[in-house]
């Protein structure tokens, strides 16, 4: 069983427990009381030039604790001031030590759109993301079927949420396109052995048509990495560990954005 399988299994357990507290129908009623989203995450990434999705992440399965001190609200506000276009918030509690409350409080505190970074395995989690204040959800091809991705994108469309469809290889890129993804992320991290190869983004970029937004995820640590992604025509880059390990996150983001 891969780490992704374990993460997906835990997400199913969490969702099952959440449904005991609030049913899907009750959650849908909560969502109906909110204004419809207007795809602000996609709009932020569509702007000219490379967009930066900056991540609030305390830990990861590959690196363990990344940030002993985790003033998540201040981190998110610093990202916004430093020019982040979007903010990614981990809500997976076991391996990433994330929390739904982190997302809710960050979404309330900043004006840039937020991505709920979690392992979406049930439509419940999409409605939950909207109620928590997210503007986008992550759909990972490795743990979903093409039909599920298609169904979840349709639900996102109804709610005005953006769906970032994450891929790891050529087969998954084609699967995402077949499912109607408008925004595809290529994860440069191999989730079987945690190795990182930013060449993934370069190799798979050519498979993604120009009318589909292209996001490079993981492994970006230098201005040179950013420059190379600009050259291949990436629309956005998602940066987590590099920023989280920086003592001055705003300065690090400014350094990475400086090549633009």
PLM-predicted stretches and their roles:
Residues 2-69:
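An N-cap/entry alpha-helix motif that binds or orients negatively charged groups
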Residues 10, 57-59, 92, 119, ...:
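Active-site beta-loop-alpha junctions enriched in small/polar residues
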Residues 56, 63-164, 170-175, 201-204:
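N-terminal active-site wall of soluble small-molecule enzyme domains
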Residues 121-132, 169-179, 216, 220-239:
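Catalytic cores of alpha/beta
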Residues 128-148, 185-194, 232-252:
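Glycine-rich phosphate-binding active-site loops on the catalytic face of alpha/beta enzymes
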Residues 183-239:
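Catalytic-face loop-and-helix region of soluble metabolic enzyme cores
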Residues 203-207, 230, 245-260:
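C-terminal helical cap(s) of enzyme catalytic domains, especially alpha/beta-barrels
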């Amino acid at each position: 069983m891969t780490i992704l399988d374990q993460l997906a299994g835990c997400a199913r357990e969490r969702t099952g427990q959440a449904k005991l507290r609030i049913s899907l129908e009750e959650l849908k009623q909560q969502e109906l009381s909110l204004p419809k989203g207007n795809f602000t995450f996609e709009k932020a990434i569509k702007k000219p030039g490379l967009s930066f999705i900056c991540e609030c992440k305390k830990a990861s399965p590959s690196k363990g604790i990344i940030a002993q001190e985790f003033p998540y609200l201040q981190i998110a506000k610093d990202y916004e001031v430093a020019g982040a276009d979007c903010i990614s918030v981990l809500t997976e509690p076991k391996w990433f030590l994330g929390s739904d409350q982190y997302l809710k409080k960050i979404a309330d505190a900043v004006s840039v759109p937020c991505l709920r970074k979690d392992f979406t395995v049930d439509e419940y989690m999409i409605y939950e993301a909207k109620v928590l204040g997210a503007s986008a959800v992550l759909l990972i091809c490795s743990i979903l079927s093409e039909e599920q991705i298609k169904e979840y994108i349709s639900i996102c469309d109804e709610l005005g949420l953006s769906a970032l469809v994450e891929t790891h290889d050529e087969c998954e890129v084609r699967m995402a396109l077949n499912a109607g993804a408008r925004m595809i992320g290529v994860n440069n991290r191999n989730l079987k052995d945690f190795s990182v190869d930013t060449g993934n983004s370069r190799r798979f970029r050519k498979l993604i048509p120009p009318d589909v937004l292209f996001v490079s995820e993981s492994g970006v640590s230098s201005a040179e990495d950013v420059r190379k992604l600009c050259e291949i025509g990436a629309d956005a880059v998602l940066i987590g560990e590099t920023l989280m390990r920086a003592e001055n996150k705003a300065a690090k983001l400014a350094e990475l954005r400086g090549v633009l």
